[in-house]
């Protein structure tokens, strides 16, 4: 209710006004009896609670001088301010409840950890960021990269690392032996419906890893299966290889058939690189072909690492299926 004040008794801490039906009312200001308009509420709250730091979105920035003035009038010093930019949708539009174009916290947590969300929100607060489902895998992998980097940093580096602030200085170790983006690719080629399918690949690549000993990895495997089925699977589009791509894929397959280098991801990557370098300029066209023909995606992981995780024999079979046209009709 917005009504004019008939009387203000500063000594007694009361106000007098006419109610909606014309009845004169006198109420104490305390005890939750009254509420300020939102603009003066900022400055009054700062003064009453001795606030020394306030973060808020840029939509409040134009009113900051008003908030500060009210705080000073009430005899207090305004706090230090930090204004952050707003989140945008994938098309660069402002997120709003009415348009339903937002990504909610619950939706993020369906596919990734709370820490990955904290990491995403921490980065570049003064830059407007697009927040939609496709940014989740990158945020997860970058968060774990920072966890691993933290272990080798000096004190200054640790203080500048986002994970120090996310965890309040008590930073855990990453137990992700496989990147989240790689888990998504594994889920894709194996059509995984359950995280146990992914653990078969994970434990071949990292035999000491277990769901019990690597709870973060286990949660990520479950998130990856869920994310794959909800977002990747409906959008997968395989294409047939060109003649040049077919020749390169046959060469890669034949070299893999005689491969005796174990599951060394770097050695496998070197071989994949060499096959492409003989035929493609620019070389990225080769890797794009691998992703589009074998994974049904426009981008993907370091392919040597993928082979090491998925398996050499399995990759040979995958290439054979692609060359036979089985993937484009799947």
Task: For the regions a language model picked out, list residue spans one by one.
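Catalytic adenosine-cofactor/nucleotide-binding cores of aminoacyl-tRNA synthetases and other
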Residues: 59, 64, 84-226, 295-329
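Short polybasic/polar patches that bind polyanions
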Residues: 72, 110, 277
